[in-house]
Amino acid sequence: MTKLATSINRLAFDLFPKLSRAQPGNLVFSPASISFALSMTWGGADGQTAKEMQQVLHFESSSSEVMEASGKLIAALTDRSRPITFRVANQLFGEKTYPFEPSFLSQTARAFGAPMQQVNFKTAHEPTRRLINEWVEQQTENRIQNLIPNRGVDSETRLVLVNAVYFLGDWAAPFDKQRTQPNPFHLSPSNTISVPTMSRTGSYRIASKDGVTALELPYEGNDLSMIIVLPDAVDGLDAALSSMDETRWRELTNGLSHESVWVSIPSFKLEPSAPMRLSTPLRELGMRTAFDRRNANFSKIANPPNPQDRLYISE
């Protein structure tokens, strides 16, 4: 799983600058979720399509090995014995009249727990869209609604692959709500606002390197954590983001060690926004053929006799 984690982190740092340019302001996305979904698709790709996907996803093993490692990682993340809730749900929604390859369906079901639900895109695509959105809402405790917008699928849709991630956890060392108070927060060197700020003193793992400081905040159970990276300079955010990659991230996090730390961070809430369009950044990274209707090769997912009915990724 270590190789897979490295691949996911590399994809994260490839995508982050492209997504942040396309969506100014705060940005939240799950590189693991993207990797899981695309690895299922890669397992059904062949030829140039598969080659480009493998390079962009930084996979160094065979598709079967990546799928097996992904399944093990998902199982580790969703261990129900932990005091936190972490769900990773995968599902395939396929046109009931389409000739999907049984080997692909069994592979995704075995590795990802992603069975195929047969649906009617051809003549009932709008009810099917609502069905998929209801499934996502159920898996995410209604946090993600209307994932597929109006006209997001049509009568030509043959397969929708959905990956939903839901996390709920408390800090291992909770912040006292009564100590939350307004404090200045620097949006930029010239723009400071007042925000509710929570604070506490405790023993945390912390590291400083190359103009940034990383702080690890563990969740209850201490198996999962959030790592916050803060530039040392008020105007250092752009430089920190542009220089960070998987190698520097690994060096920074490998240097984490326990110290007594006064932690002061803004109260924040993560909420889903409009769905991100990944086609443009993935094309820019080199995954072009998968989005090309004429040249995409997903013959291991399905190989219909009519070339016009072959699969490609639309979004």
Regions found by a protein language model. Give the residues of each.
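C-terminal, non-catalytic macromolecule-binding modules
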Residues: 246-251, 282
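Non-catalytic, conformational "gating/processing" segments within enzyme and secreted inhibitor domains
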Residues: 63-234, 254-315
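Short Gly/aromatic-enriched secondary-structure transition segments
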Residues: 53-57, 175-184, 238-247
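Flexible propeptides and autoinhibitory/regulatory segments associated with cysteine proteases
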Residues: 1-52, 63, 138, 142
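"Short basic amphipathic alpha-helical interaction patches in structured regions
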Residues: 51-56, 105-109
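Short, polar/flexible loop-turn hinges at active-site or ligand-entry regions and domain interfaces
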Residues: 59-61
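Acidic/polar, low-complexity extended loops/arms that serve as protein-protein interfaces
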Residues: 241, 250-251, 258
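Extracytoplasmic/secreted cell-surface and envelope-processing proteins
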Residues: 49-53, 236-238, 272-274
